[in-house]
Amino acid sequence: VLDDNLDEVRQMEKKMGTADKGRMDQYLTSVREAEIRTRRADDWLDTPLPQISDSDRKRTNRKVNKAQAGDYFRTVYDLMVLAFQTDVTRVATFSLGGEGDAFAIPEIGITESRHQLSHHGGDEGYMEKLTNYDTFAIEQYSYFLSRLEETKDLNGKPLLGSTMSLFGSGMSYGHSHGNANLPLV
């Protein structure tokens, strides 16, 4: 668009004052930047997906029962890594479960939901289970970060170096619904 009209623009600029030329330059720069972004987006749509290794394909091609929380979490994290690796997306969100319905983790002996455990009332058994639950969740997140570090992007660099990741909770102290000083990594 800009190139097709550049001669006409240059003729107009000869009649403009300094301030108007500055505004015109800002406008033309904005148009050029929009053209570049549009061209880049069009090119991206036609870019074939890269090949993935058989080990990555097997890692993400499995039926996972939510009762096996570790397998479930790692599968979702693997899918996120694969999406970043192949540049299918640059944004992903994963909730381990809502504050009110995060599921039990029977594989480590936790039959209560996280929400139920957070209302521990000072019960040491519940508090220990809550600690174990959170430890388990952060171990799964650590798995995700490790996968980002060991997986290369399209330029051959670790994905972790070009990824911003946030892990946290909407409650700092669930027993009283405290939401100040939220625990975030």
Model-derived segments and spans:
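Ligand-binding pockets and gating/stacking loops
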Residues: V1-V185
